[in-house]
Amino acid sequence: MEEAKHNEAEEAQGIEAREAKQIEAGETSRSSRKLITFEPKLVINKGISVLGFVLRLFAVFGTIGSALAMGTTHESVVSLSQLVLLKVKYSDLPTLMFFVVANAISGGYLVLSLPVSIFHIFSTQAKTSRIILLVVDTVMLALVSSGASAATATVYLAHEGNTTANWPPICQQFDGFCERISGSLIGSFCAVILLMLIVINSAISLSRH
């Protein structure tokens, strides 16, 4: 009787051990499946964050470069017909001054946002800071777009003039000035495109949380 009880106890222990192993194996397989499905999502989130950082870095060069190019633009020429020295600089035109201010503000913000963007690369679960960046990114996009649009009208008048209003073009005399403000305008519109991509990138990143 004692041997039978002993055998039954051993069999019960064996059954419990097998059940424990099966449960452990099931949990291991479930955790491995979670790991397999989690890793691609983590890689994609990090990739989106890295792309956002790169876009911000290029946008910094676009905005600050445009502001510096426009803000240091001036030219002086001698009018042979009137024998006077003619001068022109960006501050003579309010739209160009607004252009410089808009790009400078946006460039300063983008520089300050770079550390936050780096933080998002290592902390893919951050949500509040992403919402703040998305809102401010949209405001900066509107600011730079308005500055570039306002400057475009002035640059066009400088090149083509307006015969109806009797405004002659000035680029025939101030060709260096016009070339520089035109180049600055191109850089600013490139920054507008980059800011649009940044907003889209931020929205996609936020939607994945």
UniProtKB/Swiss-Prot annotation:
Keyword vocabulary terms for this entry: Cell membrane, Glycoprotein, Membrane, Transmembrane, Transmembrane helix
Subcellular locations according to the entry: Cell membrane
Membrane-spanning intervals of the chain: 50-70, 96-116, 131-151, 184-204
Side Cytoplasmic, residues: 1-49, 117-130, 205-209
Glycosylation sites: N162
Extracellular side: 71-95, 152-183
Keyword presence, Membrane: yes
Region feature Disordered, mapped onto this chain: 1-26
Primary site of residence: membrane
Record-stated family: Belongs to the Casparian strip membrane proteins (CASP) family.
NCBIfam families: A_tha_TIGR01569
Protein's recorded name: CASP-like protein 1A1
